[in-house]
Amino acid sequence: MKKGYIAFAALCAAALASCTCPSAGEQRLRPSEYVSTLVGTQSDFSLSTGNTYPAIALPWGMNFWTLQTGKMGDGWAYTYGAHQVRGFKQTHQPSPWINDYGQFSLMPVRGEDKFDEESRASWFSHQSEVAKPYYYKTYLADHDIRVEITPTDRAAMMRFTFPDSKESGVVIDAFDRGSQVGMVDDRTIVGYTTRNSGGVPENFRNWFVVRFDTPFSAIELTDAPGGYKPGSNLLYPEGQKSVTGEHAVAKV
């Protein structure tokens, strides 16, 4: 019996010796690295494989962000088989059948007159897409712009990297139904979106502030016929390489 205990102890010691602990320079793989936010996104009205969208968000975050491939108001905001980006949307959507509320979007573009969701749309490829809960990156081929997004508890940080040539801009679309967008100064946009799918008070508003690290050279405040889609097109001078925006949001 004593020999058995000794043999068992020796076996345990050998097993422990074979285990390697991460060195000081090594990083442990975070659980979030195992998450693919693209699972379930190959869905549409006729067939669901999950009816999800690639949420860029922290656990229990106030707001989620997602790439928008569908048209404004489409419950399937992101479909894996789509090849065009229309914007990067703040969303609170629980499912495509219930749809969204309090949403607005930002879209970096090149050139002027890009407010309409069709004219500002850009081709993108999943080959250039990185989709993690804490970080999203893609490349807008038609505009030659790289987009990066990372979330906070209540907001998000975005970085748009533009080409060296041609005038660049950022479209802020607060969607329809009485939403408003205005300018505080040459770095700050404030507004609110009233867009919803029902079930909210009559005076519902989702207020937002967008603060940029670089002043814009001009602003075009847009209000389509009938007050359909208020928003703004911020223009940056030629040679502006990178713009970072920070957003803050409050619901009333």
Per-region residue spans from a language model:
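Bacterial Sec-dependent signal peptides at the C-terminal "C-region" and cleavage site
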Residues: 16-28
